[in-house]
Structures are given as C-alpha cells and as structure tokens.
Curated annotation (Swiss-Prot):
Organism per entry: Clostridium perfringens (strain 13 / Type A)
The UniProt record lists the keyword Transferase: no
Keyword list, A-Z: Ribonucleoprotein, Ribosomal protein, RNA-binding, rRNA-binding
Record-linked Pfam families: Ribosomal_L23
Name listed for the protein in its UniProt record: Large ribosomal subunit protein uL23
Encoding gene (name): rplW
Listed GO MF terms: rRNA binding; structural constituent of ribosome
Subunit relationships: Part of the 50S ribosomal subunit. Contacts protein L29, and trigger factor when it is bound to the ribosome.
Function: One of the early assembly proteins it binds 23S rRNA. One of the proteins that surrounds the polypeptide exit tunnel on the outside of the ribosome. Forms the main docking site for trigger factor binding to the ribosome.
Length: 97
C-alpha cells in the first residue's frame, strides 16, 4: 500500500503530557498503523520542513466498550513521538506552549 506523507500523519496529540514534552523538542502524533519509523520520519520532514533526530512509536489496542447490550470496540491506533534536531521547531505548535 502506497502511503503519502499526509496519509501517514493523522493528527497531533494535544495533551498536558505532550505539551510538556515540547519543551524538550518532542512532538506527538497519531500515525497510520502500517507506517514504520523511516516513513514517519520522512513524512514529518516533508510536511513540516524540519530535521528529525529520533522517532519512537507505540501501538495501542482499542478498548472494548459496551452501551446497554451492545458491545463494540474502539479503533486501534499508533502513536509516534518525534524528537527534532537541535534548533528545529514546528510552527503549528508554537502558539500552544
């Protein structure tokens, strides 16, 4: 399956923990489940025009939820923590700190 850079990066994670990590030049994104670290690195460098130093990924299994007698499951997702090279920053997040 051919993934474009915009297919790989789904959305940013905006939580208290991820905002605190921005002080250390680390940014968190929800990414495509099939994307590997090399693809994620290339996508972030292409979309945000920055230099990536490190990529850490985590896979999460969706929780089983129940509403009345109906049982369902939330979607699985993959999260990537991107460490940028010294002196780089993503402008999209600058106003949020």
């Amino acid at each position: 399956m051919k993934l474009t850079s915009h297919d790989i990066i789904r959305k940013p994670v905006i939580t208290e923990k991820s905002m605190a990590a921005m002080a250390e030049n680390k940014y968190t994104f929800i990414v495509h489940m099939a994307a590997n670290k090399v693809q994620i690195k290339r996508a972030v460098e292409e979309v945000f025009n920055v230099k990536v130093a490190d990529v850490k990924t985590m896979r999460f299994e969706g929780k089983t939820k129940r509403v009345g007698v109906h049982i369902g499951k939330r979607a699985d997702f993959k999260k990537a923590v991107i460490t940028l090279a010294e002196g780089s920053s993503i402008e999209f997040f600058e106003g949020m700190q």
